[in-house]
Amino acid sequence: AWVNSGVTNIQGRYSTGMKSSQMQTGENAIMITFAQRILPWISFGANFKILRHDLPITESDQLTGSGIGFDIGVLIKTGQFNTLGIMVQDISSNYQWDTGDVYAEGRLYKDEFPTIYRIGSRTNIKGLIVVGDIGLITNHDTFASVLPRLGVEYGFLDQYYFRGGYGNGRTAFGLGYEYGLFKAHDSHIDYAFSMDWTAQTAHTISYAFSF
């Protein structure tokens, strides 16, 4: 999967205060996911992430930070319609910056992501899937905060899906469409609209192929 987020139409200015060109900044993540069922009631999964962050410095120069990260998780089936999940997110995730080419006294440094420990559960109530989890955010050595999340999904004709949820300070609504490309139900297209408390909005489109 590829995830992109950024801001465009940033008004650049010269040192005198006069306007220069329009600039933009962006973050990109490419994620490769693997999962394996070990026993009928337990599965293991992992994400490998390639990260990149571009910051505008001048009209023609940008400062780029890049790095890698990992997520691991275990999924346990606790009943016919219930599952329990445990996950560790952003293991060793970081941006590494080199400002030597931008500033005469620049240096190499690393921005490390907080590591998040999550535990959650899912249940199916007459076709309505309810998912919730709670995350413990740590600054590697110390506890920082608690992050709760809740989501619901309703399937129609085993092909169309309607979703809603709250998490990370954002409320979201979405749609999903499942179809067969090479075999039945092997492809998924999903769209989500989200908004935070400051009324900042985001649109996310994703595609998944199962094999």
Where in this protein do the model-derived segments appear?
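Outer-membrane beta-barrel porins/channels
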Residues: 1-211
